[in-house]
Curated annotation (Swiss-Prot):
Keywords: Cell cycle, Cell division, Cytoplasm, Septation. It is found in: Cytoplasm. Coiled coil: none annotated. This is Cell division protein SepF. It comes from Arthrobacter sp. (strain FB24). Pfam families: SepF. The keyword Cell cycle applies. Residues 19-45 have a biased composition (Basic and acidic residues).
């Protein structure tokens, strides 16, 4: 038991090496002593180290080295930054709240979206309008009511020009969140 504790202490560096321990408690036979010293000598003698000559690359070797052809990739202009012309508008007739993903993906890509919620129930239509309001707020766009249940979601670079009609009380109350 003491031997195991002593070996652990030596391993952790809390005690001196094995040579003091062996000389105090154990007297090895002459054959064992010779083999132990022979093992220690083998451990101490490192292998000879050779220096490796480094070759410096010649200018001809660098020219002969294969290089893959490089084709530059031109980045397409982002549709959000494009203000020169409007190419498309998406009209979506959602049937359930699950269609919100399609609305969000189109608007995120910079495409104005006309959302017609006439085919939806009132509760789901309100949820979808709330989602759309958050979407345009997060992407700095705008949302405008076209008719009672039809809305236009436009990105920040699109300006909508139209009549500034006052909406009647019955139309305004449908999506009034106050």
């Amino acid at each position: 038991m003491a031997g195991a504790l002593r070996k652990t202490m030596i391993y952790l560096g809390l005690a001196d090496g094995d040579e003091h321990y062996e000389s105090e408690h154990h007297t090895p036979h002459k054959d064992e002593d010779d083999s132990m010293e022979h093992d220690r000598e083998e451990r101490r003698a490192p292998a000879p180290v050779r220096e490796i000559a480094r070759e410096t690359p010649t200018p001809h070797a660098a020219e002969e080295e294969y290089r893959a052809p490089v084709t530059p990739i031109k980045r397409a202009a982002s549709s959000r930054e494009e203000t020169t012309g409007l190419r498309q508008i998406t009209t979506i007739h959602p049937r359930s709240y699950n269609d919100a993903k399609l609305i969000g993906e189109s608007f995120r890509d910079g495409i104005p979206v006309i959302m017609n919620v006439t085919d939806m129930g009132e509760a789901d239509a309100k949820r979808l309008v709330d989602f759309s309001a958050g979407l345009v707020f997060g992407l700095r766009g705008s949302i405008e009511r076209v008719t009672n249940k039809v809305f236009l979601l436009s990105p920040s670079y699109v300006e909508v020009i139209g009549d500034d009609k006052k909406v009647s009380e019955t139309q305004a109350s449908f999506f009034n969140q106050s």
